[in-house]
């Protein structure tokens, strides 16, 4: 059995059409058919059910495909690891982060990093915590910047910084002149929050629970800036971090004296998984940056 046969098999299994698969592989149809026949002969079982030039995987084919895909993944990752070691100061970091960190923090962080490491580039993904963690576990992301998470193997997470959360109200709100309030003072308000599954929403829900508040939630969105816009329109109030670049001309932020309103942000990676030298360099840079 040859490696080339596995590549041919994987392509044919994906396209399920001999002519299209052969064209994709830049070989003739007879050459592809002979290669698959030799593979089936080597395994001792047919891998496809055939109907003319259209084919589909049978029971044996599905089992074998799972193993081939795993082998291909290991092979690809092995090549990438070797290339990364050959060029430790060049490469790409796949970084995921929360929407609320994308206004200035992540751009500023990457900007300062690239002043020292101009040959390292980034693939960036923004989303909520659950989505980021799934992509981290699948290998699509090297690192994530997100709020504190429950301990979960094999995810490694360490704290970087804490940020205060404020109550944002329209400028004409009765509480707008106050410097600070307790959460209980706004228990009867209409709230504009992020959707369930977002790290900030999880933190806010915990604050409501601590204050024994059942919030009247009017709107749920995906962006902190959108929530702030709804507050400016007088549609409710919200609990958000003090985002740089946020238009605060029509809204007022108020500090919460009780309970303590803050969230913890950290960096996450997969323990035991190979981390390319460039990703490791960025990870250590971030940790050092926030420990100063």
UniProtKB/Swiss-Prot annotation:
Residues 1-58 form the HTH lysR-type domain. GO terms for molecular function: DNA-binding transcription factor activity; sequence-specific DNA binding. The keyword Protease does not apply. Keywords: DNA-binding, Transcription, Transcription regulation. Residues 18-37 bind DNA. Belongs to the LysR transcriptional regulatory family. One of its GO terms (biological process) is regulation of DNA-templated transcription. The keyword Amino-acid biosynthesis does not apply. CDD domains: PBP2_GltC_like (cd08434). The lineage of its organism: Bacteria, Bacillati, Bacillota, Bacilli, Bacillales. This is Uncharacterized HTH-type transcriptional regulator YybE. Transmembrane segments: none annotated. One of its GO terms (cellular component) is cytosol. PROSITE patterns: HTH_LYSR.
């Amino acid at each position: 059995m040859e490696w080339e046969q596995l590549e041919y098999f994987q392509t044919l299994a994906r396209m399920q059409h001999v002519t299209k698969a052969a064209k994709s592989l830049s070989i003739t149809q007879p050459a592809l058919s002979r290669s698959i026949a030799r593979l089936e002969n080597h395994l001792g079982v047919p891998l496809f059910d055939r109907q003319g030039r259209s084919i589909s995987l049978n029971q044996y084919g599905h089992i074998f495909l799972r193993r081939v895909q795993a082998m291909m993944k290991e092979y690809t990752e092995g090549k990438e690891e070797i290339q990364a070691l050959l060029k430790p100061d060049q490469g790409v970091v796949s970084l995921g982060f929360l929407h609320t960190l994308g206004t200035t923090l992540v751009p500023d962080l990457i900007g300062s990093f690239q002043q020292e490491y101009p040959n390292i580039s980034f693939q960036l993904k923004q989303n909520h915590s659950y989505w980021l963690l799934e992509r981290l576990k699948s290998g699509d992301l090297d690192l994530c910047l997100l709020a504190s998470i429950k301990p979960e193997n094999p995810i490694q997470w360490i704290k970087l910084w804490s940020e205060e959360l404020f109550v944002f109200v329209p400028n004409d709100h009765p509480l707008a002149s106050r410097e600070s309030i307790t959460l209980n003072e706004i228990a009867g308000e209409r709230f504009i929050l992020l959707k369930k599954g977002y790290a900030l929403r999880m933190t806010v829900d915990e604050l409501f629970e601590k204050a024994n508040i059942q919030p009247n939630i009017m709107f749920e969105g995906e962006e902190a800036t959108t929530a702030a816009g709804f507050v400016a329109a007088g549609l409710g109030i919200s609990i958000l971090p003090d985002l740089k670049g946020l238009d605060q001309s029509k809204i007022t932020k108020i500090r919460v004296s009780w309970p303590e309103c803050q969230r913890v942000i950290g960096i996450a990676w997969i323990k035991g998984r190979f981390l390319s030298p460039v990703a490791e360099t960025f990870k250590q840079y971030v940790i050092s940056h926030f420990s100063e």
